[in-house]
Amino acid sequence: MLTFFRLVQYCDVQHRNIPRLRRQVPEPLLEIHPATAAAGRIQNGEWVILETATGRIRLKARYKDALHPGVVATAHGWWQGCQELGLPGYDPFGPEGANANLLVSNDVIDPISGSVPHRSQRCRVRKEGVSA
């Protein structure tokens, strides 16, 4: 199950181009329980592919013991590069990017708020380079 979180270093999708902030969280992350990662032979710090029925993105795995083993979590907003640190931007619309919005369908929308389900997406995680 996929859920989303916000990074306190950034304001929604902004400021990833600021070196002082980018040094703290330099790459898009997938937080994953170590046992879940071990089942997929995913090492801490490796690039992974996160897929839902709607799309896929590329993220760096970061172990987090506090997560339930059946849950992974990521933050949205990765597209800006940070030229001063030599860190790339990410294609906001392609499968090699890190745009978490690509993982969420607009088919189910809350009738009152218009919000999409950012807290409950079925997903699959695999090590980059391993066939689906």
Spans of features found by a protein language model:
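Long, low-complexity segments enriched in small/aliphatic residues
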Residues: 1-18
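Long, contiguous, secondary-structure-rich segments that constitute the structural scaffold
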Residues: 15-132
